[in-house]
Amino acid sequence: HIDGGLKNLPSEKQVVYSRFINPTKYVIRKHSEIRMKTFNKLNDKEDILIIGDSHSEDLVNAVFEANLNSKYEFSSYYISVNCGVLFVKNKIDREDSRIGCKKMSFYNEDLKKLINSADQVWIISSWRKQDLYYMEESLLNISNLNQNFKIFGTKSFGSISKSWYKRTNQDKWSTLVIKDSDIILFKELE
Protein backbone atom coordinates (compact mmCIF):
# COMPACT_ATOMS: atom_id res chain seq x y z
CA HIS A 1 0.00 0.00 0.00
CA ILE A 2 2.68 2.47 0.97
CA ASP A 3 4.13 2.73 -2.54
CA GLY A 4 0.79 2.74 -4.35
CA GLY A 5 1.60 -0.61 -5.98
CA LEU A 6 4.66 0.60 -7.90
CA LYS A 7 6.85 -2.13 -6.44
CA ASN A 8 4.76 -4.68 -8.37
CA LEU A 9 5.79 -3.19 -11.72
CA PRO A 10 9.01 -3.85 -13.68
CA SER A 11 11.81 -1.50 -12.59
CA GLU A 12 11.78 0.52 -15.84
CA LYS A 13 8.06 1.25 -15.42
CA GLN A 14 8.62 2.16 -11.77
CA VAL A 15 11.08 4.86 -12.86
CA VAL A 16 8.70 6.30 -15.48
CA TYR A 17 5.59 6.27 -13.27
CA SER A 18 7.42 7.66 -10.25
CA ARG A 19 8.18 10.81 -12.28
CA PHE A 20 4.46 11.46 -12.83
CA ILE A 21 2.81 10.37 -9.60
CA ASN A 22 3.59 10.19 -5.94
CA PRO A 23 2.17 6.73 -5.20
CA THR A 24 1.74 7.32 -1.49
CA LYS A 25 -0.23 10.51 -2.10
CA TYR A 26 -2.31 8.77 -4.78
CA VAL A 27 -3.41 6.02 -2.38
CA ILE A 28 -4.66 8.40 0.32
CA ARG A 29 -5.67 11.49 -1.72
CA LYS A 30 -9.25 10.64 -2.71
CA HIS A 31 -10.04 9.16 0.71
CA SER A 32 -8.79 12.38 2.34
CA GLU A 33 -10.80 14.54 -0.07
CA ILE A 34 -14.09 12.90 0.91
CA ARG A 35 -13.28 12.29 4.60
CA MET A 36 -16.32 13.15 6.75
CA LYS A 37 -17.99 14.77 3.73
CA THR A 38 -21.62 15.64 4.43
CA PHE A 39 -23.99 14.04 1.94
CA ASN A 40 -25.94 16.27 -0.45
CA LYS A 41 -29.48 15.09 0.19
CA LEU A 42 -30.81 17.18 -2.75
CA ASN A 43 -29.28 14.97 -5.45
CA ASP A 44 -30.61 11.60 -6.64
CA LYS A 45 -27.47 9.70 -5.67
CA GLU A 46 -27.39 6.95 -3.08
CA ASP A 47 -25.13 7.94 -0.16
CA ILE A 48 -22.40 5.48 0.83
CA LEU A 49 -20.06 5.94 3.79
CA ILE A 50 -16.82 3.92 3.61
CA ILE A 51 -15.13 3.33 6.98
CA GLY A 52 -11.89 1.49 7.53
CA ASP A 53 -8.13 1.20 7.54
CA SER A 54 -5.81 1.41 4.53
CA HIS A 55 -8.04 -1.09 2.73
CA SER A 56 -10.76 1.57 2.76
CA GLU A 57 -8.36 3.90 0.94
CA ASP A 58 -7.98 1.24 -1.76
CA LEU A 59 -11.75 0.72 -1.95
CA VAL A 60 -12.35 4.47 -2.30
CA ASN A 61 -9.86 4.59 -5.18
CA ALA A 62 -11.54 1.60 -6.83
CA VAL A 63 -15.05 3.09 -6.69
CA PHE A 64 -13.86 6.39 -8.15
CA GLU A 65 -11.77 4.69 -10.85
CA ALA A 66 -14.85 2.64 -11.77
CA ASN A 67 -16.80 5.93 -11.99
CA LEU A 68 -19.32 4.74 -9.39
CA ASN A 69 -19.40 8.31 -8.09
CA SER A 70 -21.67 9.14 -11.04
CA LYS A 71 -24.39 7.03 -9.41
CA TYR A 72 -23.39 7.16 -5.73
CA GLU A 73 -22.15 9.86 -3.40
CA PHE A 74 -19.28 8.79 -1.16
CA SER A 75 -17.91 9.91 2.17
CA SER A 76 -15.15 8.24 4.18
CA TYR A 77 -13.67 7.83 7.64
CA TYR A 78 -10.22 6.41 8.43
CA ILE A 79 -9.38 4.20 11.42
CA SER A 80 -5.90 2.71 11.76
CA VAL A 81 -5.71 -1.08 11.58
CA ASN A 82 -3.73 -0.87 14.83
CA CYS A 83 -6.79 0.60 16.54
CA GLY A 84 -9.21 -2.01 15.28
CA VAL A 85 -12.01 -1.05 12.91
CA LEU A 86 -14.61 -1.97 15.49
CA PHE A 87 -17.61 -0.08 16.85
CA VAL A 88 -16.89 -1.03 20.45
CA LYS A 89 -16.14 1.44 23.22
CA ASN A 90 -13.76 -0.58 25.41
CA LYS A 91 -11.22 -2.55 23.44
CA ILE A 92 -7.98 -1.46 25.13
CA ASP A 93 -6.36 -4.86 24.49
CA ARG A 94 -6.95 -4.34 20.75
CA GLU A 95 -5.62 -0.76 20.50
CA ASP A 96 -2.06 0.43 19.99
CA SER A 97 -1.49 2.96 22.79
CA ARG A 98 1.11 4.86 20.72
CA ILE A 99 -1.41 5.88 18.04
CA GLY A 100 -4.16 7.69 19.93
CA CYS A 101 -6.95 5.38 18.91
CA LYS A 102 -9.62 7.35 20.77
CA LYS A 103 -9.28 10.12 18.14
CA MET A 104 -9.96 7.61 15.33
CA SER A 105 -12.74 5.79 17.11
CA PHE A 106 -16.22 5.04 15.90
CA TYR A 107 -17.25 6.89 19.06
CA ASN A 108 -17.21 10.25 17.31
CA GLU A 109 -20.53 12.12 17.37
CA ASP A 110 -20.04 13.57 13.87
CA LEU A 111 -19.31 10.08 12.53
CA LYS A 112 -22.46 8.72 14.20
CA LYS A 113 -24.50 11.43 12.44
CA LEU A 114 -22.89 10.54 9.12
CA ILE A 115 -23.60 6.82 9.68
CA ASN A 116 -27.25 7.70 10.39
CA SER A 117 -27.56 9.81 7.25
CA ALA A 118 -25.94 7.29 4.88
CA ASP A 119 -28.04 5.00 2.70
CA GLN A 120 -25.31 2.36 3.05
CA VAL A 121 -22.27 1.95 5.29
CA TRP A 122 -19.32 -0.08 4.00
CA ILE A 123 -16.80 -1.20 6.63
CA ILE A 124 -13.50 -2.64 5.46
CA SER A 125 -10.42 -3.76 7.34
CA SER A 126 -7.53 -6.11 7.45
CA TRP A 127 -9.30 -7.95 10.26
CA ARG A 128 -7.15 -9.56 12.94
CA LYS A 129 -7.85 -12.67 14.96
CA GLN A 130 -8.49 -10.65 18.15
CA ASP A 131 -11.20 -8.69 16.28
CA LEU A 132 -13.43 -11.78 16.40
CA TYR A 133 -13.95 -11.29 20.13
CA TYR A 134 -15.55 -7.87 19.48
CA MET A 135 -17.28 -8.52 16.17
CA GLU A 136 -20.75 -9.43 17.47
CA GLU A 137 -20.96 -6.35 19.71
CA SER A 138 -19.54 -4.16 16.96
CA LEU A 139 -22.14 -5.31 14.41
CA LEU A 140 -24.96 -4.81 16.91
CA ASN A 141 -23.76 -1.26 17.67
CA ILE A 142 -23.50 -0.41 13.97
CA SER A 143 -26.96 -1.81 13.24
CA ASN A 144 -28.40 0.43 15.97
CA LEU A 145 -27.35 3.42 13.82
CA ASN A 146 -27.79 2.03 10.31
CA GLN A 147 -29.02 -1.43 9.38
CA ASN A 148 -27.86 -1.21 5.79
CA PHE A 149 -24.17 -2.03 6.09
CA LYS A 150 -21.68 -4.30 4.37
CA ILE A 151 -18.50 -5.77 5.81
CA PHE A 152 -15.42 -6.27 3.62
CA GLY A 153 -12.18 -8.01 4.50
CA THR A 154 -9.02 -9.44 3.10
CA LYS A 155 -8.94 -12.58 1.04
CA SER A 156 -7.60 -15.93 2.16
CA PHE A 157 -7.05 -18.81 -0.17
CA GLY A 158 -6.00 -21.14 2.62
CA SER A 159 -2.69 -22.91 2.66
CA ILE A 160 -2.35 -23.72 -1.04
CA SER A 161 0.60 -21.86 -2.51
CA LYS A 162 2.16 -21.20 -5.90
CA SER A 163 4.63 -24.03 -5.29
CA TRP A 164 1.73 -26.44 -4.62
CA TYR A 165 0.35 -25.70 -8.11
CA LYS A 166 3.78 -26.21 -9.68
CA ARG A 167 4.32 -29.63 -8.13
CA THR A 168 0.71 -30.92 -8.34
CA ASN A 169 -0.83 -32.44 -11.44
CA GLN A 170 -3.67 -30.32 -12.88
CA ASP A 171 -6.28 -33.05 -12.45
CA LYS A 172 -5.79 -32.75 -8.67
CA TRP A 173 -6.23 -28.96 -8.56
CA SER A 174 -9.90 -29.25 -7.65
CA THR A 175 -9.10 -31.59 -4.76
CA LEU A 176 -9.52 -29.96 -1.37
CA VAL A 177 -6.14 -29.52 0.31
CA ILE A 178 -6.20 -27.99 3.77
CA LYS A 179 -3.37 -27.90 6.29
CA ASP A 180 -3.97 -28.80 9.93
CA SER A 181 -3.38 -25.15 10.88
CA ASP A 182 -6.29 -24.12 8.63
CA ILE A 183 -8.55 -26.76 10.18
CA ILE A 184 -7.70 -25.47 13.67
CA LEU A 185 -8.44 -21.89 12.58
CA PHE A 186 -11.80 -22.88 11.06
CA LYS A 187 -12.75 -24.67 14.30
CA GLU A 188 -11.79 -21.59 16.35
CA LEU A 189 -14.02 -19.42 14.15
CA GLU A 190 -17.09 -21.61 14.73
Where do the model's predicted regions map?
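Extracellular/periplasmic envelope-modification machinery, especially enzymes
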Residues: 1-190
